[in-house]
Amino acid sequence: MHTAARTLSSTRSSPLQRHRMALLALLLAGSALLLAGCASTRPPPGVTAVTPFDVQRYQGHWYELARLDHAFERGMTDVSATYTAQADGSVRVVNRGYAPASGQWREAVGKAQFTGAPTTASLKVSFFGPFYGGYHVAALDPDYRWALVVGPTTGYAWILAREKHIAPAQQNAIVAQARALGVDTAALIWVTHERQDPAH
């Protein structure tokens, strides 16, 4: 045991240790690049954020009708988002959804800030301290009844609406707009809304 301790604490590393350190450095570098890509706050190529945009009209409760799959919402049903404009110009974000695997409602609270003028629907959102990701309203109903949102890439996309369901013709039109922007609409997950959220 003492010999092993001295070996681990030695300033001279073995070839195996050097190999492991090099592998760790590569993994860390790859992770940093991945985080940098995910943390982009600019609209992806081909996507233009809606302008003019009125955050006072946009705030309030939205239901998530469809999304592309990603780890932080995987398996969730009855997903909703509530946006509240703050006095400092930021937007409070509360995302909620039901996790069938655990039988529990889950909630994530974040903060969104405009990346430029508040009349352009391009924001950065954070749920994890200093790490931000892009949130861009790419299409919006004139009456603010539905919205198509794209993240830092077109691999992140959501269709939101004020109601749990919208007319099929309207749904098809939104999907067509998403497809034109480069979103893989065949991969969209349509969210079920069968439960009453106790928070609403």
Kindly give the residue locations of the regions a language model identified:
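Bacterial N-terminal signal peptides that target proteins for export
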Residues: A4-L26
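A beta-rich soluble binding module of mature secreted/lumenal proteins
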Residues: H2-A5, L24, L34-H200
